[in-house]
């Protein structure tokens, strides 16, 4: 069992090495839009999971997730060799690639928040012209305040303790 801090440092280094190799050394066109977002290494330092995202060629085009996964699987051996040569550890971790779903979840949450904001704006527009169904203050009785203040003056004037 290795130190968790060492596993984190190793994961960061593996992420950097693999990202650099994908960008500059591996010439597979399926990996052109692949970005390594995170890496996790098990505490025994034998397995590394690399999380990746894929960018589409344009904003309207859906990314090719299957092609990127196939390209990463094909390049896995070369990438592991590069990681082993760069790290200088006794055992080079096996590499596994997993698609990072955080950006997709973030887009879905942004869409839900935009929908909620639009609903709030619609409700605010409806409220601006709205009036209460009944009177402005249905519990207020006109004239009741005058009677209550008159009763208080009468009670204050006749104090039987002073006599």
From Swiss-Prot:
Gene Ontology cellular component list: cytosol
Q: Which organism is it from?
A: Mycolicibacterium vanbaalenii (strain DSM 7251 / JCM 13017 / BCRC 16820 / KCTC 9966 / NRRL B-24157 / PYR-1) (Mycobacterium vanbaalenii)
UniProt-recorded name of the protein:
Ribosome-binding factor A
Family per UniProt?
Belongs to the RbfA family.
Summarizing the function annotation, the protein's role is: One of several proteins that assist in the late maturation steps of the functional core of the 30S ribosomal subunit. Associates with free 30S ribosomal subunits (but not with 30S subunits that are part of 70S ribosomes or polysomes). Required for efficient processing of 16S rRNA. May interact with the 5'-terminal helix region of 16S rRNA.
UniProt gene name: rbfA
Q: Where are the annotated segments for Disordered?
A: 124-163
Q: Which UniProt keywords apply?
A: Cytoplasm, Ribosome biogenesis
Give the Pfam families listed for this entry. RBFA
Oligomeric state and interaction partners are given as: Monomer. Binds 30S ribosomal subunits, but not 50S ribosomal subunits or 70S ribosomes.
A GO biological process this protein is involved in?
maturation of SSU-rRNA
Subcellular location per the Swiss-Prot or TrEMBL entry: Cytoplasm
Please tell me whether the keyword Cytoplasm is annotated for this protein.
Answer: yes
- Looking at the keywords, is Lipid metabolism present? no
Q: This protein's superkingdom?
A: Bacteria
- UniProt signal peptide: none
A molecular function annotated in GO for this UniProt entry is: ribosomal small subunit binding
Q: Show the ranges annotated as biased composition (Acidic residues).
A: 144-163
**InterPro entries, per database record:** KH_dom-like_a/b, RbfA, RbfA_dom_sf, Ribosome-bd_factorA_CS
């Amino acid at each position: 069992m290795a130190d968790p801090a060492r596993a984190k440092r190793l994961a960061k280094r593996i992420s950097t090495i693999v990202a650099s190799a994908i960008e500059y050394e591996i010439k597979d066109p399926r990996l052109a839009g692949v970005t390594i977002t995170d890496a996790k290494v098990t505490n025994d330092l034998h397995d590394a999971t690399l999380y990746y995202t894929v960018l589409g060629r344009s904003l309207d085009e859906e990314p090719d997730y299957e092609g990127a996964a196939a390209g990463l699987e094909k390049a896995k051996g070369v990438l592991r060799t590069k990681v082993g040569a760069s790290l200088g550890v006794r055992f080079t971790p096996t590499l596994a690639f997993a698609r990072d779903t955080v950006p997709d979840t973030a887009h879905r949450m942004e869409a839900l928040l935009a929908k909620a904001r639009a609903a709030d704006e619609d409700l605010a527009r409806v409220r601006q012209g709205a009036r209460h169904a009944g009177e402005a203050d249905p519990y207020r009785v006109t004239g009741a305040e005058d009677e209550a203040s008159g009763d208080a003056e009468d009670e204050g004037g006749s104090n039987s303790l002073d006599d």
